[in-house]
A protein has these predicted regions:
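Alpha-helical metal-binding/catalytic segments enriched in His/Glu/Asp
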Residues: 1-50, 165
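His/Asp/Glu-rich mid-to-C-terminal helical/loop segments that flank catalytic regions of hydrolases
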Residues: 20, 27, 31, 139-203
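Composition- and surface-driven signal marking solvent-exposed, interaction-prone regions
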Residues: 12-15, 55, 144-146, 184
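Soluble non-cytosolic domains of exported or imported proteins
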Residues: 12, 16-20, 47-51, 88-91, ...
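Short, histidine-centered active-site or binding-site loop motifs used for metal coordination
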Residues: 1-5, 75-77, 147
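Acidic/histidine-enriched alpha-helical segments
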Residues: 35-45, 72-73, 178-190
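Metal-dependent peptidase/peptidase-like ectodomains
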Residues: 7, 33-34, 43-142
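Stable alpha-helical elements in mature extracytoplasmic
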Residues: 18-21, 25, 52-53, 93-96, ...
Length: 203
C-alpha cells in the first residue's frame, strides 16, 4: 500500500484506506501463527510514478527471489463501488479468488491485468501480484483533488474488505505449498512491457 497522496488531496480514499487496511492485516497476523514469513511494506511516491515500490525492488533484488506473492491495497473501504481484484499472475489465481468470494459470500470482480499501483514493480520482477480496490466511476472523480476526504469512507465496508483480504492472505500464508506459480505468464509480461512503455500497444 502507498501512504502518499497529491498536494490538493487529504488522501483518505487514495490511499489512507489501503495504508490503514494493511495495518489491520498486520495486526491480524500478529495474533495468529503462519507458515510463511510475511513482510508488510508501505511505499512512498506512488503518485509520482510508483517510485517507492520501484526503489524497494531495486534495493532488495535478492529478497525478491524469496517472495512468492505480493498483495497490494489501493483504495478500499469507500461507501460505494464494486470490490475488485486485479491479478498480475497466472489465470489460476483469478479462479481461486472467484471461488473464495463465493465461499465467503463476498462479491468480488476479478481480472487478469496490470494494475496502476505498487504491485506492478514487483510483478515486473517476476513476483505474482494481486491488487485489491473498491472502485466506481463516481469515486474516481474524487481522487487527486480536494474531494478525497473521510466523507467517502465507510467503516463497515472497510471491515468487510479487510476481512476478505485477510481470508485470502490466511490461505496463502498457511498453505503447505504456495498454490501460485512463481513465474509471470507471457500475456502478463507483454502487458507489463506496454504499461512500462517498453513496448507499444498494437491495439
Amino acid at each position: 500500500a502507498h501512504y502518499d497522496s497529491t498536494s490538493l488531496s487529504q488522501g483518505a480514499y487514495d490511499n489512507m484506506s489501503g495504508s490503514v487496511g494493511l495495518l489491520g492485516i498486520a495486526e491480524h497476523f500478529a495474533r495468529i501463527p503462519h507458515r510463511y514469513g510475511l513482510r508488510f511494506i508501505w511505499c512512498g511516491s506512488e503518485e509520482r510514478g510508483l517510485l517507492g515500490a520501484k526503489a524497494y525492488c531495486r534495493d532488495h533484488e535478492e529478497d525478491l527471489k524469496k517472495i512468492v506473492l505480493n498483495i497490494n491495497l489501493d483504495m478500499i473501504g469507500c461507501i460505494m463501488g464494486k470490490f475488485i481484484a486485479c491479478v498480475t499472475a497466472e489465470e489460476k489465481l483469478c479462479n481461486y479468488l472467484n471461488y473464495l468470494g463465493l465461499e465467503k459470500g463476498f462479491s468480488v470482480s476479478v481480472s487478469q491485468d496490470v494494475y496502476s499501483s505498487d504491485s506492478t514493480p514487483f510483478a515486473d520482477k517476476g513476483v505474482p501480484a494481486v491488487s485489491f480496490a473498491r472502485i466506481a466511476p463516481p469515486n474516481t472523480g474524487t481522487i487527486h483533488n480536494s474531494y478525497d476526504t473521510v466523507a467517502l469512507m465507510s467503516g463497515e465496508q472497510m471491515v468487510k474488505d479487510i476481512d476478505f483480504i485477510c481470508a485470502f492472505a490466511d490461505r496463502m500464508a498457511n498453505a503447505v505449498r504456495c498454490p501460485i506459480a512463481r513465474e509471470m505468464p507471457d500475456n502478463m509480461k507483454e502487458k507489463l512491457d506496454i504499461y512500462l512503455n517498453r513496448k507499444r500497444d498494437k491495439k
